[in-house]
């Protein structure tokens, strides 16, 4: 189990993080950065995260993040596509969340509709959680504008764009 401000940084065209358990996440548990390859693939397989004050997975690179068989509890967001990066990759990001259970989490995924981001949910178990928060991202470092939520309710499978 890990405790610190930021935990794991994956730099480049992809990585696999398997069966890692984070507790008391302060800033981000996993940060993905350093790639402009739209075909980059990042995998989070198994594991869990608890007590994240903000987000668990921060996606600053291009590409797609695949989160599967994961448990998250007591956190702000499971996943956030960068909504105000003023350097590095600026463009479409995607996340596919499968077989995930969320408890006491504000939002499963935060995406930027103006960048073409999407979040796909399959067999996700949650209650009292917003599945997808949609934002208008920017490239100037300012806080992005929240547009609203989608995929809420008891639906365990949907796509948010």
Label each residue range with its predicted role.
Residues 1-2, 9-161:
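Extracellular beta-rich repeat passengers
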């Amino acid at each position: 189990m890990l405790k610190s401000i930021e935990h794991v940084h994956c730099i480049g065209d992809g990585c696999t993080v398997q069966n890692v358990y984070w507790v008391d996440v302060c800033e981000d548990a996993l940060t993905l950065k350093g790639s402009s390859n739209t075909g980059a693939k990042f995998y989070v397989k198994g594991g869990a995260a608890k007590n994240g004050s903000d987000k668990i997975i921060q996606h600053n690179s291009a590409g797609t993040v695949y989160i599967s068989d994961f448990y998250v509890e007591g956190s702000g967001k499971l996943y956030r596509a960068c909504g105000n990066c003023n350097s590095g990759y600026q463009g479409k990001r995607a996340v596919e969340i499968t077989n995930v259970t969320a408890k006491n989490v504000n939002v499963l995924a935060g995406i930027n509709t103006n960048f073409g981001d999407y979040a796909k949910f399959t067999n996700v178990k949650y209650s009292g959680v917003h599945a997808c928060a949609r934002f208008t991202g920017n490239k100037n470092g300012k806080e992005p504008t929240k547009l609203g939520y989608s995929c809420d309710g008891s639906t365990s499978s949907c796509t948010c764009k």
